[in-house]
A protein has these predicted regions:
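M14 metallocarboxypeptidase catalytic domain recognition
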Residues: 2-5, 13, 21, 34-598
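Sec-dependent signal peptide recognition
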Residues: 19-25
Length: 598
């Protein structure tokens, strides 16, 4: 059955004045179930001006594959009480724009008169209760899996929900149903996502969302950073930002999530976070951030084009409609720098270090949903949780509706990516594209909508800063074990050289290169910038006990991001590789004798 996409694409949304126009391709995009059918080319188009009265696109009409309630559901016997809220950081008129929802969500951390959110012990008990409830019923199976420990020894756990024969990863894979991975609170001061996932865990296990499990499997990690959550602080115990550690995998928390992804192979990954109200907006633009949610799917170089189309038409558009139906507002993920002279507002960038982009490079539909609330304490907490529950319920419903297509999509993408080895070009460094945008804020005094025109760095059509011929694979020195271990955590196939060999390859040499404007943003995000390099064609000596990483595998694009030295956040830039002599590009299929690492 071919996959049908509408002619309009997401880049026609919400922009005020286009800077560049690119040609559109055919109005229909077809992908046959047979993987021999080539994916049609797709050239993104920078947005055209649109009327401000039609901010949200109409969702693509889809015949539901299963009839379930996918709007937020009220928990049993809710108690209509007002939670303890923090002092207002803005005027009462602005606060009035964020009324509590009609539904009252009930988790341990959302009870009346609480000053803290769900504790680690309460979270464990809540998840355990969902497993216990399902043990008394037939059909749905549940398990609470230990997936690791935080830097301070707190348990990291995942709740698995399925109608398969078991809850281990092999059983989920044999169901033929797509698996959705939901995780939250990788920054400890972003609690709404965690509380929302507890609500969804109960509704999937015992409530009105349980019928979705006829079509999908769900894995939930409600809290990835329990150490930060215990302090109400963003960073992990060692001071790392877990949100920027999904390529390097330096923290045990990010490693635990990577192992879970490697084993359960989710087709859809959702990161539920919160965005922080920034003082830069009132100072530079005279307005307060207004949106209940910011959302962005993977926007990084070398993504399969079909993932971008699926993220837009199968997920983002229905999600917009769901939030709008609940009276909630949403915008692309964006931020402004604290530099008073810099009036640019930027979408999240193409760097592969966050989960949104890293999981996209693993051929999953990867989405980041951030509610309005980091740093707000308990202020508007019911609305923030309502935003998360509404948005993620839409993602679950979209996955159930597209379950058959998504199950066909994974083998197609894996074959396509693996088949690109030794062919064409690969983008090493990309940047957002400058544009103009009408951004809505709130008047800080009256709370009324306020629209301003801003310089806008768009991630919807990336600029290629540097690219080179795609190699057949990469050679790594025998001293590159730390990098090899991280690649294998991701699920990358790595071969060990058994007999000394000579390989035709490109060697890296340091070479000056003009600085790019994005380097300042990389520094603000804590992303290591790679060195400036030039390529020298030559012979690579591959001794025994060195390594070969072929690109003829499904995770080839993740390998490129990790091993091209000048890619942002690369393993050389982040010092998992010691120097340029530890890595080389192999430019012809090697005949070297190797064995796959166990």
């Amino acid at each position: 059955m071919p996959y049908l996409f509408s002619k309009s694409v997401h880049h026609a949304l919400l922009f005020r004045r286009p800077v560049v126009r690119l040609a559109m391709t055919a109005p229909l995009f077809l992908l046959a179930a047979c993987t021999s059918v080539p994916l049609p080319p797709w050239v993104p188009e920078l947005p055209r001006p649109v009327s401000r009265t039609n901010t949200f696109p109409t969702p693509v009409p889809v015949e539901p594959a299963v009839v379930v309630q996918t709007m937020p559901v009220a928990p049993p016997a809710p108690v209509a009480v007002s939670p303890v809220e923090d002092p207002l950081p803005y005027s009462p008129a602005v606060a009035a724009r964020f009324p509590a929802p009609t539904v009252v969500y009930s988790t341990p951390g959302l009870q009346a008169n609480r000053t803290n959110f769900t504790t680690q012990d309460e979270l464990h008990a809540w998840l355990r209760d969902q497993v216990a409830a399902l043990s008394r019923s037939a059909g749905v199976k549940a398990a609470l899996l230990p997936i690791g420990a935080s830097q301070q020894g707190r348990a990291l756990e995942a709740l698995v929900l399925t109608r398969g024969s078991g809850t281990d990863h092999a059983s989920l894979l044999t169901t033929g149903r797509p698996t959705v991975l939901l995780f939250a609170q990788q920054r400890g001061d972003e609690p709404a996502g965690s509380e929302g996932l507890l609500v969804l865990a109960r509704e999937l296990a015992q409530g009105l969302l349980q019928p979705l499990l006829e079509r999908i499997n769900v894995v939930i990690v409600p809290r990835l950073n329990p150490d930060g959550a215990s302090r109400g602080e963003a960073l992990a115990a060692g001071g790392q930002d877990i949100a920027q550690d999904h390529l390097r995998l330096d923290t045990p928390e990010a490693q635990a999530l990577a192992r879970l992804v490697r084993d359960y192979q989710p087709m859809v990954v959702v990161s539920a976070g919160e965005y922080r109200l920034s003082g830069a907006y009132p100072q530079k633009f005279g307005g307060v951030q207004k949106f209940d949610a910011l959302m962005q799917y993977a926007t990084t170089p070398n993504l399969p084009e079909f993932l971008t189309r699926a993220g837009e038409e199968w997920y983002r558009r229905p999600l917009l409609a769901s939030l709008k139906g609940q009276g909630l507002s949403i915008e692309w993920s964006h931020s402004a720098s604290s530099d008073a002279s810099d009036r640019t507002v930027s979408m999240e960038g193409p760097e592969p270090v966050n989960s949104r982009n890293a999981e996209g490079l693993k051929n999953a539909v990867s989405v980041a949903i951030d509610s309005r609330g980091a740093g707000l304490g308990r202020l508007h907490i019911q609305r923030r949780v309502h935003t998360q529950v509404t948005a993620i319920t839409s993602v679950l419903g979209s996955t159930a509706q597209r379950a058959r297509e998504l199950s066909q999509l994974r083998p197609y993408l894996e074959k396509e990516v693996a088949g690109l080895a030794c062919k064409g070009q690969v983008v090493v460094l990309a940047a957002n594209t400058p544009a103009q945008y009408d951004l809505q804020l709130l008047d800080p005094t009256t709370g009324a909508d306020k629209t301003i025109a801003v310089d806008w760095d768009s991630a919807l059509a990336l600029r290629t800063v540097s690219s080179r011929i795609r190699p057949c694979g990469y050679w790594l020195s025998g001293s590159s074990t730390p990098a090899v271990e991280r690649l294998r955590l991701h699920g990358v196939k790595v071969l060990e050289v058994i007999e000394p060999s000579a390989l035709l390859g490109d060697l890296y040499r340091e070479a000056p290169r003009p600085a790019i404007a994005q380097s300042g943003r990389l520094a603000r995000q804590g992303v290591a910038a790679g060195p400036d390099v030039a390529l020298v064609r030559g012979v690579v000596d591959a001794p025994a006990k060195s390594f070969y990483v072929p690109l003829s595998q499904p995770l080839a694009n993740l390998v490129v991001a990790a091993l091209e030295p000048d890619a942002p956040g690369s393993y050389l830039a982040s010092r998992l590789l010691k120097g340029l002599g530890d890595v080389a590009r192999v430019m012809a299929e090697p005949t070297v004798k190797t064995q796959e690492l166990p």
